[in-house]
Amino acid sequence: MKYLSAILEEKRREVEALKRQNPSARYRDVASSLPSCRGFARALQGEGGSIRLIAEVKKASPSRGVIVEDFDPVRIALAYEALGASALSVLTDRHFFQGSAGYLQQVAAAVSLPVLRKDFIIDELQIFESRIMGADAILLIVAALEPSELHDYLQMAGEIGLDVLVEVHDRHELALAIESGAEVVGVNNRNLKDFSVDPATSASLRPYFPSGVIAVSESGLKTADDIALVRDAGFDAVLIGEGLQVSSELRSLSWPNA
């Protein structure tokens, strides 16, 4: 997992710097005193077989470099809200994705939709930080955490009102997510070894989701056929970033909230 290892190494340095500046107990107290979040998990539940859209506000990626040169996160977020998205995802990783906490804060203030903080969370301080910056949900990546950390971080997030999207790549990680109590699980179609993508990854794992767990397909969804594939496999939602930026076909689909 070459890409993930490099990202986590950089993230550990960032977290250590954050810890030197801000005690975790102080962050926890502030996060616990904030008003209720907008329900991320609730927004992904629907009837009638429609698949929900989590639209990602994304400037760049390690595999593609800069995707949007004239990047205006609020303009993009408002366009996605008008498109019919049920929730938004905002990249906050600076080093690899050119994101920022400021982007999430701006977006959360501008829209009525729940907002997911998309980053590599490896420490409890980041969970409290996410709540303070305005996130309604966070991403936890099974491949980046020990099983005990995954369990504990899910519990911590719930205690301060955050929903959690738990990301998996295979059956083993899916089992760990379920055992840890995940209620929303995303299958990442991207291979973390080489960053190649295959939407069929989601379809192959869907039969192993227990009833009641919200299923999300992530990454590499670029055509209406890709959406149909995961919809027909029984997914509740899709998370799309780059695809919405480059594909008019995806933007023209009829999303439930439009």
UniProtKB/Swiss-Prot annotation:
Its EC number is 4.1.1.48. One of its GO terms (biological process) is L-tryptophan biosynthetic process. It catalyses: 1-(2-carboxyphenylamino)-1-deoxy-D-ribulose 5-phosphate + H(+) = (1S,2R)-1-C-(indol-3-yl)glycerol 3-phosphate + CO2 + H2O. SUPFAM superfamilies: Ribulose-phoshate binding barrel (SSF51366). CDD domains: IGPS. HAMAP family: IGPS_B. This is Indole-3-glycerol phosphate synthase. It comes from Chlorobium phaeovibrioides (strain DSM 265 / 1930) (Prosthecochloris vibrioformis (strain DSM 265)). The gene is trpC.
